[in-house]
Curated annotation (Swiss-Prot):
Signal peptide: none annotated. InterPro entries: MFS, MFS_dom, MFS_trans_sf, Sugar_transporter_CS. It comes from the Eukaryota. Keywords: Membrane, Transmembrane, Transmembrane helix, Transport. Belongs to the major facilitator superfamily. CAR1 family. It is found in: Membrane. This is MFS-type transporter tazK. One of its GO terms (cellular component) is plasma membrane.
C-alpha cells in the first residue's frame, strides 16, 4: 500500500488497509481452530502494516524538517508504547471469562473508534492527487475541459502499477545501500524489543515468582524510557535547527544520525544492565530500572532512522519505508519464535548478553 499512496493518494490506501485490519479481528475472535486464527492473525499483521508504511510519506507532505522531527517523535513513541502497554493489558484480559478472544474484540473496538476519528480529521495531503481533484472541480465549475493536472497527463494503469510501483519497495531496498543498511539496523533493533517481551515474563514470572500480571508491569519502565527518548530526540532536533539557523544553514538528513549514536550507546548500556541484574538473588528494582535506557535507545534509534529516511525520500518515503516495514515485521515476528528456547538454554542473563 505504500506505493499505492504515491499513485492514489495517502488517505484511500491508508484507510483501506485500516478497515481490513479491523475486520480481520472478527474471525480471530470467533475462530474455533488454530488455522483460522493463524491465517487471520497473519492477514491482520499484513493489513496493519499499511498505516506505519504510509504515515512517513503523509508527514513529509506538509511538515518542514524541524516540525517533522517532533511529529515523528510522537508517532514513533506510540508505535513502541503500544506493544509495551499491550503486553500488560492482554494479561489482564486473559483473566476474563472470554480469555484471549477478548484481546481481538478490544482491538476491533479501539480500531473502529480511532479509525472513524482519523477518517474525519485527516485530509488528503499528497500534492499530485490534491491537484488532480482541484483540476476536476475546476472543470466542473468552469466547463473548461482543458484544465488538467500533472497526474492527468500520465495516468497510471493497473498493469503499470502492478509491474512498476508494487515492486518499488523491494527494488529500492536491494538497489540502495543506505536504505538497506538502515533497514538491517532498524529490523535488528525492532527484533530486540520483541525478544525482551519474552525475556520479561521469563525473568520476573518464572525466575522471580511474580504473578502473570505483575510480571509484565516492569515493562512500564521501557515505556518511561520511550517517552524520555522522544523528548530527547525532539530537543535535539530543535536545538540543531537553532544552531543551523544561527550559522545560516539548513537542517540536512545527516543531522538525524547524531542522536542515534546516543541511542545506540543507551540501548547497549540498558541491555548489559538488564542482564547483569537479572539474578533472582538481586533486588528486582535495578533490573526494572534497566528498562529506561533500553526504552530511550530503542525510541531514539527507530525515531531518528525513520526521520532520516523521510528526509531523504520525501514524497517517495512511503515506498522506502514499506520495504523497511516488510523486513522489520518479519524480524519482529520471527525473533520471539526462538526466544523461549534461547532463554531456557542459556538463561536470561547470558541470552541478553548474546543478543547485545
Amino acid at each position: 500500500m505504500g506505493p499505492a499512496s504515491e499513485v492514489y493518494g495517502r488517505k484511500l490506501p491508508f484507510f483501506l488497509g485500516y478497515v481490513l485490519f479491523v475486520l480481520s479481528q472478527i474471525p480471530v475472535a470467533l475462530g474455533h481452530d488454530a488455522p483460522t486464527v493463524l491465517v487471520f492473525r497473519f492477514l491482520g499483521g499484513v493489513t496493519s502494516s499499511v498505516c506505519p508504511a504510509i504515515t512517513g510519506g503523509w508527514l513529509a507532505d506538509f511538515l518542514l524538517p524541524a516540525e517533522r522531527g517532533v511529529a515523528v517523535a510522537i508517532f514513533a513513541a506510540t508505535t513502541l508504547v503500544g506493544p509495551s502497554i499491550g503486553a500488560i493489558t492482554s494479561q489482564v484480559q486473559l483473566q476474563t471469562a472470554m480469555g484471549w478472544r477478548m484481546t481481538a474484540w478490544t482491538t476491533m473496538i479501539l480500531g473502529i473508534v480511532s479509525g472513524v476519528a482519523g477518517f474525519i480529521i485527516l485530509p488528503e495531503t499528497y500534492l499530485p492527487v490534491v491537484e488532480q481533484r482541484h483540476a476536476r472541480k475546476l472543470r466542473q465549475e468552469t466547463k473548461d475541459w482543458a484544465l488538467h493536472s500533472r497526474l492527468d497527463e500520465k495516468p497510471v494503469s493497473i498493469r503499470e502499477f502492478l509491474t512498476k510501483y508494487l515492486t518499488l519497495p523491494i527494488s529500492m531496498l536491494v538497489s540502495e545501500p543506505i536504505l538497506l543498511s538502515m533497514t538491517i539496523y532498524i529490523s535488528f533493533t525492532f527484533g530486540l524489543i520483541y525478544l525482551l517481551f519474552v525475556a520479561y515474563p521469563v525473568s520476573f514470572v518464572q525466575e522471580r515468582g511474580y504473578g502473570a500480571i505483575d510480571g509484565t508491569l516492569p515493562l512500564l519502565s521501557i515505556c518511561a524510557g520511550i517517552i524520555v527518548g522522544a523528548f530527547y530526540a525532539s530537543w535535539s532536533t530543535l536545538t540543531t535547527v537553532k544552531q543551523k539557523a544561527a550559522s545560516g544553514n539548513a537542517l540536512v538528513p545527516e543531522d538525524r544520525l547524531h542522536p542515534m549514536i546516543v541511542g545506540a550507546v543507551s540501548l547497549a548500556i540498558g541491555l548489559l544492565w538488564f542482564a547483569w541484574t537479572s539474578s533472582p538473588a538481586i533486588s528486582p528494582w535495578p533490573q526494572i530500572l534497566a528498562g529506561i535506557p533500553i526504552g530511550v535507545g530503542v525510541q531514539v534509534i527507530l525515531l531518528q532512522s525513520l526521520a532520516y529516511l523521510i528526509d531523504i525520500y520525501t514524497t517517495g518515503a512511503a515506498s522506502a519505508i514499506s520495504g523497511t516495514m516488510i523486513v522489520r515485521s518479519l524480524v519482529g515476528g520471527t525473533f520471539p519464535l526462538f526466544a523461549p528456547q534461547m532463554y531456557r538454554k542459556f538463561g536470561v542473563s547470558i541470552a541478553v548478553l548474546i543478543i547485545q
